[in-house]
Amino acid sequence: MCVCACARVCVYVCTRHHPPLDVFPADDVITPPCSSWPLRGVMSRPACQCLRRCEVMGEVNGPVCSPEIVLASAGKTLSENGQENSPHNSDSGHETSSPDSPLTPIEEGAVSPGDDSFFVVWIKFMVLPRKLCINKDVEKLFSAAEKTGNDGEVLCPSDECDTFRIRIIAPGAEPFDLQVNSNEMVQELHQVLLEREATCHRTCFSLQLNGVSLDHFTELKNISGLTDGSVLRVVEQPYTTREARIHVRHIRDLIRSLDMSDAVNGTDGASMSYLASMTLGDRKKNADKTLECSPPDYVLPGYKERPLIPLLPVMKEPVLALKSLAISPFNPPPGHRKLKGDVLYLTFDTREGRRYHITCCTKGFYVNATTEAGFRPTPSPSHRTVHHSLLDLLSSISISFKRAMALILKRRSEKHIFERLPTPYQVNSWIAPVFEQIEDGIRAEDCTQPHKIGLEDHIPGQIRDWNEELQTTHELPRETLGERLIRERAIFKIHSDFVSAAIKVNVSMAVVDGNVVAINPADEPRTHMYIWNNIFFSLGFDVKDHYKDLGGDAAAHAATSNDLQGVRAYAQLDNPKLFTLGMVIVDYKGFRVTAQSIIPGILEREQEQSVIYGSVDFGKTVVSSEEYHDLLSKPAEQLKILPHEVHSGKDDGKIIKLCSSFETKGIVGNDSRHYILDLLRTFPPDVNYLEDAEVTDICKANGYPRTFPHKLASLRQELIDAFVEYRYLMFIRIAAYHVQQTKLGLLETDYNDDKKETTKEDTVLKVTGFSEDAIMSQIKREITADIKIDEMPLLETEAAKKIMEEVIDSDHKKVDSLDKEISETIMAKAAKAVGSIRMDAFDVRFNPDCYCSTVRHAESEDITKQRRLVAEAAEFLIVQQLPNFVRDCLQRTIMLLDGASLIDSLHSRGINIRYLGKLTKYIQNVGQLSYVKVICITELLCRCAKHIFRGYLQPVSSAHTAAAVSHFLNCLLSSSTEPLTPSNEEVSMPINSVKKSRSSKRRKQISSGGKENDDWAQMSSHKLWERVKSDADFYYAFTIDEENIDAYLSTVGIQKTSFLRRFVQIVGIQMLLRDYNLESGKKSQLFVEDDIQSLYCQAKHVDPKAVDAHSLFLSGQTKVQQGQLRAGFDLVLESLNLMNSVYGAMHSDMAQCMRLLARLSYILGDPSEALSQQHKATLMSERCNGLDSANTIIEYLNLAHFSFANLHIAAALKLLYRARYLLLLIHGENHPFMAEIDGNIGVILYAVQEFDDALKFLQNALKLHQIYLEPQALKTALIYHLLARTYSCRGDFRTALQMEKETFTIYSKTFGIDHEKTKESSDCLKHLTQQAVTFQKRINEANRQGSNNIGQLLPVEIHRPSLHSVLEVLNILNGIIFIQLKGISTSSDIGEENYELGNNNNNNNKRKKKAVEDLAVKKNGNNDDTTVISSRPQVNNMSGSSTVQVMQEVALD
């Protein structure tokens, strides 16, 4: 799809030379929808990669707007002479910072797959949403993808673009040709010049055609005289003050382009990446280097310590081009100099020790004659030349600057584009190295002047009106796909800017630190409110006792989260006439700050006068409006909110009808827009945590309702949606049952027969399954507590749907339909049974105010029934959602690696974190889920500590913050920390490499506290642990018996390093990068105050999504699951293009797209393209999710797999070592995903004949398989077989025989004695026995002859396996199975056919699309997450034969 024709706001992602993207001329900003909509430079990224195809790929002809071409340009890494370094080039073996990006199938002129047909199976799980809503434009794309052939082209909904070539001539640079399309704008050509190395230092210029300047926002097709071969000239323009400051900042950013301080400090969208520091350019020739393949000690199985130094890349020696470049204190130019063209004065300190004073005039920059003695702005006699570029001037006066700048630009050009693009939301690292602070006058100006907001040099007017921008983008047209893309991009960009402004400027530097004057300074500090940069800020305290009866400060803290959930819910509905405020919740230094956009006119009148809907006094009086009633009726239906009536509370005694909670306020702003705010009661309360509420019998048996710190606990939207869907299915089944009883007696008999057969099948599965049913039955019994539940006989869902469809069809046909009265009776029974508010249809809704005591409900409201429905929803969470989550963990449909992935998984199922204790109790005795228990308890303890830390840190002064935080960490992670006193000897004790002076300084700071609050120093390990235990019981109903944290962590198996990482992440502490040796068990002090590098903000906000792109992505996943890989690939590729046009080039959702594209490319026979896509996905995950996030670990494993497929063998091992290290760091050794990593490492080490190391990893993989998977699983058999081969290569045939016997036992039990796989294992046993006998004979012969020749005793045959056979085993371990088909069956039951894989090589890894699409996907419940399709499954033989086990699973990872 031609993105430029649809959005013109896409950030292009080809790997070329880019300048920093945080500062661009305002003229390069995209035309705003209204005059008050200024955007920063990131918005102005070019819309389409095809603009640069002549540079990147050297292509002249061909379509430039197809999605393939757009993505083709995204992965190219060019050398300085413009030649591509692909894995197939002879010179590609050199070390490089990124894997070589191969050509895509289109660039290689790829044709349809060859003659060999393959069926591809993935053994990973992925749960897809059950409902898929695709708009008409997406349906067109979906249909287009279905109709395409092997070329994979997807129809573009936009008009086709004419392409032509132009020549650009720039001062001081060689002319170059550029291929463009007619729909691009002139500003995109400006961006090309800012990205080229020869012109990247020019910012103030215009493009001219035949002497006429071109407008930035004019499309090329509208320029008269611009044709193929036209010449555009870059003409330097006069500087203004604004243009001069922009130019200086741009040069400063070029100079600092290698500086990592922004990434470490978490500013300007910068974040760290590790992948670029790894050498991925090696080839097969490096595989024999022992040094390259040997694992570091800290990743070996059994290594106890978790060093932190390897987490971050090794910092290179910084390249310093200058000492300082700053705005001169002689600014502004005096009047007489302004009249002569002076614009700005600068000072420049060189590395040679000289200072130059520089004047910027309208013509450019020159050195003036100013000295320390006085101001002389006239040109210097020794440097009279005026340079239009500041970079040229600095290079002419300083040789060291010129040399350093050349090196900086060279290294900058070697960086992958994804390393330099800003992330949409700031990603902070929890650990950081020490950086030496260097002079930076511009940074000092930005960060020390309280009146600056950081945007003055970027926008052409006053400070931004955030509310107007947010609401204007909301009102943009959305009828066509192109309009929706423009709108979604604008919404996303404005929102990300709003979040950045709320965090960067106002919280960390202003509100919490006291740098902003409150609008109510005379009030108590905790009630202060602020306005800064057109954003309203308030603290999360109970102001004026508004929440006194609901829990005080705890309720006020929870209300902000509930309010954000409501804003997110209404924003997703996207009602064009209903507006919500921009909202960001920031937690910083123990304070919660809420940032909101400001409704026009809200500050000009009293709140009582502004609110025309809802209540301003907590329900005592309520008002309503017909306008708001109409506006909220549809959202109430979508959000399952019950319209209800309440008393107005006024003397008139009116009854008011509400379509929301009474807390929701409706305000019409001065802009005539209808706003809703205070959405904290959008969803019904969680009665399990509402004291004195009436709950169901099952909930009572589980100890509910429980006392909670506040009364604002509410159910999540995901739970409401799941509950309503569950009740709808129940409604269908009940109605179908009554229809069956009334009219379809015969069908009932047939159905019962079918049900008996189904039950029989289920019984077989229970017998052969992996005790999952027994575990779930035990959990169900524990939940229900043997309470008898009255259940109506129900039909199975599919049978019920079939019956109801037949009834509906018969009604339409007016043939043999049910009597109308009978139908109404049936519907009424079903509706009553599920709690529907209507008797003639399904309509389940909740009254969010049914438990509110401050509002008086109308007598017509059935409050008892409404409360019962809310209680049943809370029971649904206990009875259905929690057990289903446990089942998903048992089936490994979700893979939890750390607390963040646990929280995401729980929230996606509507489970609140307060149920973490209940979940932990359910799984504490389930051995297969011991790793989940560790993650749950770690998260539980960290959240308890966070609750305490919040109140602990608030009263601490700024001077003692580091000391207080380090003391808290010492108390939390050790059992022997005592309160701090000035005489405490422990304070002055040196810790490891920490100097004594550091601790002495700390003691002085503590003792000099004087009148300041020093309660924090009285904390001790014992006090903190007792509070954590109490908090765990109070919040989570989880009991801890151990007397100290050391004993408890040891009992549960929690690493202190993992615990520290998770805690500092959720509270926003940045630690010093050093090895703390927490696992050594030392009793001394663990942390000192210098270990606390910084505190950063934790932000919660709405995350706008690319709706059309997401729908396409889900459609692509569905196609892949159906076996239509090419169609799925096309849809996912198109989805990536749409995301690119909405998000720009950097977003975590795009990383998921690229991961799926990489897998599909690999399966479709293009491993080089798979490597390219996976490399980008890994880089993006590191930047957007974090260096050690769960997603990043998975990306590393996939990248290692595809690197090995491209013969980057040593690189594959490095990536696997990195993945293993990260998993060790965030969790530890005992995790099922570690078995997968270790299996991969062991296989590759076996391939490079590192047998000793291979054994360590394979043995650990086997141990983990036996714990977390069924010991008789097929993957376990494969590990046994690999161990047998490895032992045999070491000459240990006795152990090898034992391993292969285990393989034989598993196969014989699974397949039977006569199965080919069992016979193959039997043959292997015979072969090993023969080798063992021969080996023993040689030993005996050597003993008899007294020979010391070790070479005679080596194993008889050690064949190095082919790389292809090793790759096949890796495929199996990573869930990708290739099956070669000798014939294509048209039968839907492929289980009836036998397909056998013969010997293959890498050149035969192509599949026919038709072969895949003709095969039906079939699943049954075999163990080890696999389903046997063929009756002749086989396991790969590492010695060279190339047979592959024939298995299948659900398609996606």
From Swiss-Prot:
InterPro entries: CLU-central, CLU_dom, CLU_N, CLU_prot, GSKIP_dom_sf, TPR-like_helical_dom_sf. GO terms for cellular component: cytoplasm. Residues 78-110, 979-1015 are annotated as: Disordered. It is found in: Cytoplasm. Belongs to the CLU family. mRNA-binding protein involved in proper cytoplasmic distribution of mitochondria. This is Clustered mitochondria protein homolog.
